[in-house]
Amino acid sequence: MRLFFRIILLVNITSYNLISQNRLNPLEIPILLSGTFGEFRKTHFHTGIDIKTLGKEGIKVRAIDDGDLIRAKVSTSGYGKVVYIRHYDGTTSVYAHLKRFSQRIEKIIKEIQYKKKRFEIEKFFQEGEVKIKKSEIIGSSGNTGGSSGPHLHFELRNTKNEKPLNPLKHGFFVLDTIPPTIQNIYIYKFLKKNASKRKRIALKKDKTLYTVIDTIKTNGMFGIGYTGYDKQNLSHNRNGIYKRELTINGEKVYSYKFDDLIFSDGKKIDLLIDYEAYNIDKIRIKKLYQSIESEFSFLEKNKYNGLFKVVKDSIYNVKILFEDFNKNISEVKMVLVGKDKEDDLYFSKNEFNDNPYKPNKEYEVKYQLLNLKIPKDAFYEPTNLNFDYKLDTLVIEKFTKAPKKGLSLEFFLPKGLDSTTLRQICIGKFNFGRKNKIQYVFGKKNYGKIYAKNISEGKYFLTKDTKPPSIKPINFQNGKLVDNLSILKLRVNDNLSGIKKYNAYINGDWILMEHEPKRNLMFIEFSNLKSDDSKLELNLIVEDVVGNVNKFHASLYREIVN
């Protein structure tokens, strides 16, 4: 067994740079995944793979093949610092959450940042403007943007249509001898009048086979859901499953796998999960059926959309195949038998829409100080909505059906507000489960009202943002020497509306200051400093979204050696 493991490890280590005839591993370490292609995320399907970077930042990132730099972007959210390279084989590679760019790319980006006097920028390049060689270092791995930990988010796209492609299908090797793990199977029974029932089914596991021991005797229209994950060797992360296939009596009734995606698929991700279980019970059950007609690029065309009817005296042999990209397979098997009486299954979860809001209609609910509007197509299907207004607070209870687009809200502003109060007044929100944390809701003010779009569940009220952002130095002090520092760090935080803009100056000259909002961190690298003065006057001006401003000043000193 030890010899087998050593052989596997050796294969993984020595093959990291032998990805395919044409492409290199973007990192100089074996590919271990913390996220797989097509994985279910909160608001989208994962359009790349997340490659682990030994839990740290700063690992060299290389171009997988020759190509042209076509785009580079710096953002405090999303992909953070990201590079796009168009290759000559019809694909584009994407390298996201970088700590920094290569010197060649960094020089171009900094010129734009200093010209625009802004940290966040985006640059599109002409074909052939910046040639990139295979294995050329294009940056170093990091944790910028919306990343929750150090890693490289890597994508491969079809250049012609921007369609994300599964990198594992295009030559990138990941050692994987572990079949998917199935945690639970759920049966859904569909009733009349937009009602359904859910039951968890106990499974018995024997290696890669999961079985339901007892025959299920029931009747009616059914669908199936599951919870599960996949793992790869040498990694503890629970990642998404590549392929799933449901068959009834040998006939395929529902299946899909993640070879590629289109970005619009992600907008409808909630249709492929039990939204009520996810939103209320915090269980992400993936459905193996579609109760609502909706197009997904990866979904196979099957006759019944995964739904099946159990009728008297009929037997239904159900098999669900789960497969990872390396063809490791797990199977679930169960038998259902039709009966004419009420089924003997006890369903612990019932959902009944007694008086639902219908997607093809618009609704407006008026209160004393606000109006709530439910636009047409706010939800994919009829749904119950519960809301209440008291003590100047609108409470919208948690949704049980997936929203298609948000609701809208308008508060009437008090009359006679002075200009400062009018600027600072805003809509606040308490999210369920986070009662002490007020969230700012962006709204436009006009004609004595403040309007907010795309709102969801939560508690809404009028509040004021009166505090400017706080600014505190981390690794330096006013009036002290900074010769031993290569970077100046400051803790910058705003209590409500968030930071809108900022500018830093040293001895009167604008200097690039980077911003990482998730860490409440701003910093200046001394390599950006052009002054040779021994005394450095640092001034930082930070403004939040509603216009509150804070200014910070520090006098710093260096010993200049002639």
Question: Model-predicted segments: where are they?
Answer:
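Proline-enriched interdomain boundary motifs that mark the N-terminal boundary
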Residues: 179-184, 468-475
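Bacterial Sec-dependent N-terminal signal peptides
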Residues: 1-26
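Proteolytic processing hotspots in large secreted/extracellular or virion-associated proteins
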Residues: 343-360, 381-426, 476-478
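Short edge beta-strand/loop segments characteristic of extracellular beta-sandwich folds
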Residues: 225-229, 410-414, 487-495
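Surface-exposed, glycine-biased beta-strand/turn segments
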Residues: 18-92, 99-101, 119-128, 133-151, ...
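Proteolytic-maturation and junctional protease-sensitive modules
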Residues: 400-457, 501-503, 509-512
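Short, solvent-exposed loop/linker segments at the N-terminal edge
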Residues: 214-219, 478-484
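Long, low-complexity serine/threonine/glycine- and acidic-rich segments characteristic of extracellular
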Residues: 103, 175, 188-342, 495-562
